[in-house]
Curated annotation (Swiss-Prot):
Matches recorded under PROSITE patterns: HISTONE_LIKE
Protein name per UniProt: DNA-binding protein HupB
Biological classification of the source: Bacteria, Bacillati, Actinomycetota, Actinomycetes, Mycobacteriales
Free-text note regarding domains: The N-terminus (residues 1-108) is stable, binds DNA and is phosphorylated in vitro by PknE, PknF and PknB. This fragment binds DNA less well when phosphorylated by PknE. Residues 1-100 stimulate Top1 and physically interact with it. The N-terminus (residues 1-40) forms an intertwined dimer, while residues 44-83 form a beta-saddle which probably contacts DNA.
This enzyme's EC code(s): 1.16.3.1
N6-succinyllysine: modified positions: 3, 113, 142
InterPro entries referenced in this protein's UniProt entry, alphabetically: Hist_DNA-bd, Histone-like_DNA-bd_CS, IHF-like_DNA-bd_dom_sf
Regulation of activity: Two trans-stilbene derivatives, 4,4'-[(E)-ethene-1,2 diylbis({5[(phenylcarbonyl)amino]benzene-2,1-diyl}sulfonylimino)] dibenzoic acid and its methoxy derivative 4,4'-[1,2-ethenediylbis({5-[(4-methoxybenzoyl)amino]-2,1phenylene}sulfonylimino)] dibenzoic acid, respectively SD1 and SD4, inhibit DNA binding with 50% inhibition at 20 uM for SD1 and 1.7 uM for SD4. SD1 and SD4 have minimal inhibitory concentrations of 400 and 800 uM on strain H37Ra respectively.
GO molecular function: DNA binding; oxidoreductase activity; structural constituent of chromatin
Length: 214
């Protein structure tokens, strides 16, 4: 769409003649150009912002020769599209069949409300999850500490002390039994020796008896 076509469409929408539509378009463009030239910005809510941007000095290259060329600092006109304009072009917002395509304070306010509500809900949910998980972790860390500090080592220590005592008493009993057995073994040969000695004396009596008979 060029300027002439724009004027034709504007003439139909306004229901006026072509001269008035042409004057309206030219006055709008003239006002924007003069404001941006001064350094001001022209904001049309929902549509966009016309502004001036400052570019610093830089080094560029000539595309034909390839030589480096120094570019002086300059000012460049720029246009930033508005939120509603972007939404309509991207398809996020429906374009109405009749009436203005961009309304003042409709798309922008709705977008801001959605942006504010969504992070708030996520933050509250994250805070609740953190609050519920934190005590559980503390309890999990405390419970093993108590068990390890009081019950488990005490039982093991008692068992460790009792079992050697039993083993020692058993060992003492075994040694006592062995000692008594050894004493009995040493005493038994003495009796045998005592029994054998009278056996040697018996033949002497027999000899004396034989002598008396003779």
């Amino acid at each position: 769409m060029n300027k002439a076509e724009l004027i034709d469409v504007l003439t139909q929408k306004l229901g006026s003649d072509r001269r008035q539509a042409t004057a309206a378009v030219e006055n709008v463009v003239d006002t924007i150009v003069r404001a941006v030239h001064k350094g001001d910005s022209v904001t049309i809510t929902g549509f966009g912002v016309f502004e001036q941007r400052r570019r610093a000095a830089r080094v560029a290259r000539n595309p034909r020769t390839g030589e480096t060329v120094k570019v002086k600092p300059t000012s460049v006109p720029a246009f930033r599209p508005g939120a509603q304009f972007k939404a309509v072009v991207s398809g996020a917002q429906r374009l109405p069949a009749e009436g203005p395509a961009v309304k003042r304070g409709v798309g922008a306010s709705a977008a801001k409300k959605v942006a504010k509500k969504a992070p708030a809900k996520k933050a509250t949910k994250a805070a609740k999850k953190a609050a519920t998980k934190a005590p559980a972790r503390k309890a999990a860390t405390k419970a093993p500490a108590k068990k390890a500090a009081t019950k488990a080592p005490a039982k093991k220590a008692v068992k460790a002390t009792k079992s050697p005592a039993k083993k020692v008493t058993k060992a003492v009993k075994k040694t006592a039994v062995k000692a008594s057995v050894r004493k009995a073994a040493t005493k038994a040969p003495a009796k045998k020796a005592a029994a054998k000695r009278p056996a040697t004396k018996a033949p002497a009596k027999k000899a004396t008896a034989r002598r008396g008979r003779k």
